[in-house]
Amino acid sequence: VDRKTQEEREMSMNRGFFRIVSTGHYTPEMILSNKDLEQMVDTSDAWITERTGIRERHIANGKTTSDLAVIAAQRAIDRIGYDKEKIDLIIVATFTPEMKIPGVASRVQAKLGLDKPGILAFDINAACTGFIYALNIAERMLSNDTYRSALVIGAEVISKVTDYRDRNTCILFGDGAGAVILEKDETKEVIFHVSSKGDTELILCAEDHISMDGQKVYQFASKAMAASIREVMSYGDISRSSIRKIIPHQANIRIIQSASKALDIPLDAFYINIQKYGNTSAASIPIALDEMLEEETPASDEKVLLVGFGAGLTSGACALSF
């Protein structure tokens, strides 16, 4: 590896410390199945399932992004009886805010009744990689001891920017929110890899509807997912045997299968719930993380890897300790 390439790799990596003290998620009650989509566009349940792995997706049906975010956040708070007054940082990753200003994070703050002095609340938009970017930002802010407790949320209402006449995109997306509460903990190391290519063409939501070049996105995503996992494992000296689960952004089962093959890591090491929710963008990783932690408890010496990719073209991964 030449010196410049090595320096570029180092710049995309960082390590820090935090503990995830609780998680929560929410998906709306309304379900749009593949059978429903058969009545709306020229497609079939078998075609969608075979090519994407998606069987159904949840639709907000009038609920806003902050509505979903607050329910996910409240579930994370209630799960362990967390004192919400300890929260002094709120970051929401989304590309579907219900209004331009105020941001979703400010609305979450208001709905949770958190009005103490010094609290910081803001949104970020890194598309489907947004949750990993938000975790990275939260870690940096917790590390300087100014903030003690961060509420990080990925929340999307993609149905409002989905063209249900476009069979190439309407089959893919769903609505939902996932939340985590973080506290600084010097015993819990976290490794991050984040990147952006500065692409403005492959995935767009310029006006009312999302559009994408599916084949080129697939090519980028398959490589980016495997590359980010490799970078995190290498930088953190993480062995395959120490990985409890890999939680990928849930965009397409074929992308996950491709990464599994490229890494020579069995598919059952990847947590997959795309069949239930479709692509929920920034919400997909925290939703999957919450579901995974409901099903199993990683040991203290095991790692959970999160990996995402999205418009921009952004990508990122992180290795968590529990």
Indicate residue ranges for each PLM-predicted region.
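Condensing-enzyme catalytic core mediating Claisen C-C bond formation in acyl metabolism
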Residues: R9-G62, Y164-K223, A227-R230, F309, ...
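Buried hydrophobic positions in well-ordered alpha/beta secondary-structure cores of metabolic enzymes
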Residues: I20-S22, I48, A76, I90, ...
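Acidic-glycine-rich active-site phosphate/pyrophosphate-binding loop
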Residues: V41-W47, K100-L114, L151-I158, I255-P266
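Claisen-condensing/thiolase-fold acyl-transfer catalytic domains that form or cleave C-C bonds
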Residues: S66, V70-A73, T96-P97, A110, ...
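Phosphate/pyrophosphate-binding loops at sites that engage ATP/ADP/AMP, CoA/4′-phosphopantetheine
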Residues: A72-D88, S228-S242, M292-T297
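Anion-binding (especially nucleotide phosphate/pyrophosphate-binding) glycine-rich loop
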Residues: R79, D83-L114
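Short beta-strand segments
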Residues: A93, N125, A150-E156, L182-E183, ...
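Flexible, glycine-rich active-site loops centered on histidine and acidic residues
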Residues: S143-G174
